[in-house]
Amino acid sequence: VESDVNSRNINGQRTSKYKILTPEEIASLKLDIEALEADLSIFRFNEGFQTGYSDKSGLIYIRGDVLSDLSSTHPRDLMSQRAVLAHEYYGHKYFDDLFGDKNPLPGAWNDEFRASYNAALNAPNLTETDRMYLMADALERAKEAGVNIKITTNIRRVLYGF
């Protein structure tokens, strides 16, 4: 079981991390992983503490909290399971592969910001809504840390379509 310190995660008030994913849910997640053109071999289902990329093992652990909470209004809760997988794979895993131990601490606002930002811009086969929620999540991460982010052309395009 991964500790909070060693696991990068999406957080939020999604479905409970204690929910055991069913074989049908896992099959659906595997289709999303395939659509994202991600390496299925690094994903572990119903293992780990919660959904998140582990810098220590180089694996992405998937728990029940990968599933949306449609009763919420927060982008982190509303984003699809595919968007969550993109956050972990095209965000945390990508930057861990690129920078290794030179990354911000797991869970730091800038680590979470860039994971959602990079996934919103670069993950293949996401819907416009997925990209919008990922970008909105990136901005929420900065806001929660008290950091102002300039709205760039990329941010505006993803959020507003222009």
Where are these regions (language model features)?
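Catalytic toxin/effector domains delivered as secreted proteins or via bacterial secretion systems
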Residues: 1-162
